[in-house]
Every structure is written in structure tokens, then in C-alpha cells.
């Protein structure tokens, strides 16, 4: 079994970024040795810090599917990848410089502002992140979160981005300019393939997310779980068999994983 999870609004509460209510299920999956693969729009440095707080060292997917990071020597797996420092990396995204070049070309016309245009203080105000975390959020490698003055312009912006080899996805707080060849679903496919090649079979997969950019991930797992937004409303997802958690954030995450583990132990899945 492999669990794939979004962070903000899913494992982490939207309002305070806490995973406190998910600790019972987190401890349970750790004891069982179940891999917990983070799939997020956050940066590598942000995820490294969160993994340390969670007490895990597992594969993770950053910046909306831009790259997959496996710890070197992970479970003795044989993985075709780029070796960099402590990681075995599979890259799907565009270089951040290319992303910024495109932003510079169109930002005045569409009145958009990306993280690269913002001070750390501005990011703190928009995200409620502590200053040191906002600094890590600004250190990007592949994608750009941005705000736009008039959301009616998004469709026109999407068309121009498409012609340049980019696309736009929507997270819980921001729009994101990303490479055309990436999304969370494609990155999840890669992780599943690595486990299959090394285990000899495809493991049962569970995915949890709350936003539009999580839909590609949810389409790639056996058990997709949709976490409600903080206002108790759900993202519109047309996906057969999707499970809707009752509560937002870490409480809904905990309840959903606890129930799935119970069902598996009873032989229901």
C-alpha cells in the first residue's frame, strides 16, 4: 500500500498548517511501514522541513508534479534517475528561469504577480506562513504561484500559456504557472511504476486532496479521497468511486485514513 497526499488544506489545515489531528493515523501508518508520499505545490525545501516534522523520509513530489524525489538508496530500489546530493530525481517540469521569463512577458498585460515579484513579507501576508517558511516557499525550481487582478482574464492567459508550452492550474490559494508536461497525476504514475518494478506488483494506492490541482492525482489512485474546503464545500470532481471526507484538513485526513486501514485489516479492500 502507498498513500499519496496533498498538504495544504488536506494533511495540513488551511488556517494554521497544523497536522495535529492527523497524528493518530500518521503513527499507525508509520508502524505499518506504509509509504506516505507527499504530492504538493510546495518547494523541495518546504517538503524537507515538513518531512522532518512528520518523522518520515519517503519519496515526495514537488511543485505540482514538476519533480519526484526519492531518497538515495530508498528501500534498495533500482531507479532510473538523476543523482543529485541526497536524492534520486526524476524531473518533469520546466526550469524556473523559463517560467519567470514568461511571467515577465505577460505580467503587465494580465496584471499578475508571481512569487518572484513579491517580497517575503508579501508572501507572509497572502499565506499566513511564518517568515522562515515563506522564504522557503519563494525558493522555487520549476513553477510560479501567482495572483491575478481579474480572474476573468484566466482563460485568455491559459491560451497564451498553452502556445508557449505552459499551463495554469489552481491550488487552494493561488494559480500556478507550470510546465505543459507535468501534473500531480503524471508524477504519481512514475512513483507507482517504480514501486511496481521493484516489488513485482502494483501496490494498492490511496490519494487525498482538496483542490483542482489534486484531481490528476486522484484519478491515478485506487482509493481517491476528496477533503472538503474549510467552508465544508467540495471541489467539483467527476470521478467514479471517490470518497468524500466529512471534515476539512487534518481531521478529515485522519478519519479517512483510519477508516481505510480498518477496512483493509478486515479484508474489505
UniProtKB/Swiss-Prot annotation:
Enzyme class, UniProt record, top EC level: hydrolase
A GO term for molecular function: phosphatase activity
GO CC annotation terms, alphabetical: cytosol
Summary of subunit composition and partner proteins: Monomer.
Protein known as: Glucosyl-3-phosphoglycerate/mannosyl-3-phosphoglycerate phosphatase
Manner of cofactor binding, per the entry note: Divalent metal cations. Can use Mg(2+), Co(2+) and, to a lesser extent, Mn(2+) ions.
Cofactor: Co(2+); Mg(2+)
Residues where Mg(2+) binds: 6, 8, 210
Pfam families: Hydrolase_3
Gene Ontology biological-process annotations: mannosylglycerate biosynthetic process
Active-site residue list: 6 (nucleophile)
Substrates-to-products reaction catalysed: (2R)-2-O-(alpha-D-glucopyranosyl)-3-phospho-glycerate + H2O = (2R)-2-O-(alpha-D-glucopyranosyl)-glycerate + phosphate; 2-O-(alpha-D-mannosyl)-3-phosphoglycerate + H2O = (2R)-2-O-(alpha-D-mannosyl)-glycerate + phosphate
Superkingdom classification of source: Bacteria
Source species of the chain: Persephonella marina (strain DSM 14350 / EX-H1)
Thermal dependence summary for this entry: Optimum temperature is 85 degrees Celsius.
InterPro entries: HAD-like_sf, HAD-SF-IIB-MPGP, HAD-SF_hydro_IIB, HAD_sf
EC number: 3.1.3.70, 3.1.3.85
Family: Belongs to the HAD-like hydrolase superfamily. MPGP family.
Amino acid at each position: 500500500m502507498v498513500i499519496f497526499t496533498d498538504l495544504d488544506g488536506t494533511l495540513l489545515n488551511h488556517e494554521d498548517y497544523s497536522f495535529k489531528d492527523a497524528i493518530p493515523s500518521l503513527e499507525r501508518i508509520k508502524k505499518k511501514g506504509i509509504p506516505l508520499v507527499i504530492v504538493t505545490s510546495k518547494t523541495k525545501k518546504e517538503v524537507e522541513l515538513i518531512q522532518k516534522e512528520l518523522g518520515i523520509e519517503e519519496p515526495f513530489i514537488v511543485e505540482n508534479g514538476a519533480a519526484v524525489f526519492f531518497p538515495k538508496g530508498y528501500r534498495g530500489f533500482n531507479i532510473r534517475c538523476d543523482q543529485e546530493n541526497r536524492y534520486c530525481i526524476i524531473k518533469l517540469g520546466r526550469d524556473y528561469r523559463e517560467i519567470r521569463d514568461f511571467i515577465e512577458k505577460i505580467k503587465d498585460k494580465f496584471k499578475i504577480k508571481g512569487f518572484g515579484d513579491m517580497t517575503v513579507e508579501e508572501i507572509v501576508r497572502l499565506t499566513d506562513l511564518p517568515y522562515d517558511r515563506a522564504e522557503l516557499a519563494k525558493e522555487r525550481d520549476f513553477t510560479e504561484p501567482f495572483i491575478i487582478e481579474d480572474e476573468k482574464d484566466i482563460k485568455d492567459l491559459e491560451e497564451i500559456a498553452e502556445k508557449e508550452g505552459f499551463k495554469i492550474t489552481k491550488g487552494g490559494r493561488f494559480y500556478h504557472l507550470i510546465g505543459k508536461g507535468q501534473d500531480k497525476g503524471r508524477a504519481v504514475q512514475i512513483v507507482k511504476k517504480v514501486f511496481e518494478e521493484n516489488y513485482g506488483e502494483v501496490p494498492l494506492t490511496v490519494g487525498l486532496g482538496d483542490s483542482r490541482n489534486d484531481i490528476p492525482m486522484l484519478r491515478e489512485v485506487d482509493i481517491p479521497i476528496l477533503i472538503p474546503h474549510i467552508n465544508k464545500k467540495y471541489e467539483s470532481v467527476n470521478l467514479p468511486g471517490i470518497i468524500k471526507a466529512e471534515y476539512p484538513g487534518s481531521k478529515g485526513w485522519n478519519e479517512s485514513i483510519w477508516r481505510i486501514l480498518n477496512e483493509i485489516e478486515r479484508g474489505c479492500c
